[in-house]
A protein has these predicted regions:
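Conserved glycine-rich cofactor-binding loop
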Residues: 8, 15-16
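The beta1-alpha1 cofactor-binding region of Rossmann-like NAD(H)/NADP(H)-dependent oxidoreductases
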Residues: 40-41, 61-72, 104
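Active-site helix of classical SDR
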Residues: 122, 158
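Residue(s) in the substrate-gating loop at a strand-loop-helix junction
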Residues: 142
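Substrate-binding pocket helix/loop in short-chain dehydrogenase/reductase
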Residues: 98-99, 103-108
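SDR active-site lid
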Residues: 174-205
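Active-site loop immediately N-terminal to the catalytic Tyr-X3-Lys motif
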Residues: 99-100, 147-153
Length: 205
């Protein structure tokens, strides 16, 4: 985007870690931030940090797995901060362990958050983004979305899906004013590891 100052950004998983850091970085550049997180305490803490920078923030407690709840967010954000021009789909979870030991429930859990959470976010906000003079979607993948790792099979699966989804969506929107970026962070110590599943989850801490 040509400018960030005066824009409204929606950041999921903004209550901690990369989501909080991204929110603060955008706020420092003049964006108002809609802080979206399933944990209200973390979301409020992030919002307070943003406001301490002299920037507006609103808090929206939401589970990205829930398409109905995600569908409610655009009108909530617009009512609090105005129409958004930036969407950062950052919310995610991880797992570590042998694929053979993972249950179907484990796989559905990580796919629902890491993949469907991104899809629900894009579906909910794309109509609003398409009305802006310039807009951008940022989807958080991982280095394992480029090169899958053993004992991180389910996580690699989801981040590879985010990569492919983002690249396809970018190509679909290339002639519009909505850009799409997919980000591939390396290993970063955040509290995503606190909720990790799998027999080797402890090694992530």
């Amino acid at each position: 985007m040509k400018r960030l100052s005066g824009r409204v950004a929606v950041v999921t998983g903004a209550g901690s870690g990369i989501g909080r850091a991204t929110s603060l970085a955008l706020a420092e550049r003049g964006c108002s931030i809609a802080v979206v997180d399933v944990q209200p305490d973390g979301a409020e803490e992030t919002a307070d940090l943003i406001r301490s920078l002299g920037t507006r923030a609103s808090v929206h407690v939401a589970d990205v797995r829930d398409p109905k709840r995600m569908g409610e967010l655009p009108s909530e954000v617009e009512g609090s901060l105005g129409s958004c021009q930036i969407l950062v789909n950052n919310a995610g979870v991880t797992a570590a362990g042998a694929f053979a030991d993972e249950t179907v429930e484990d796989l559905r859990w990580i796919v629902d958050i890491n993949v469907w959470g991104v899809v629900h976010g894009c579906r909910a906000f794309l109509p609003m983004l398409q009305q802006a003079d310039e807009a951008h979607i940022v989807n958080m993948s991982s280095m394992v979305g480029l090169l899958g790792l053993p004992h991180n099979v389910s996580y690699s699966l989801t981040k590879g899906a985010v990569r492919a989804f983002s690249e396809a969506l970018r190509a679909e929107l290339v002639a519009t004013q909505v850009g799409v970026t997919v980000v591939f962070p390396g290993a970063i110590h955040t509290n995503i590891t606190a909720g990790a599943r799998g027999g080797q989850a402890a090694r992530l801490a």
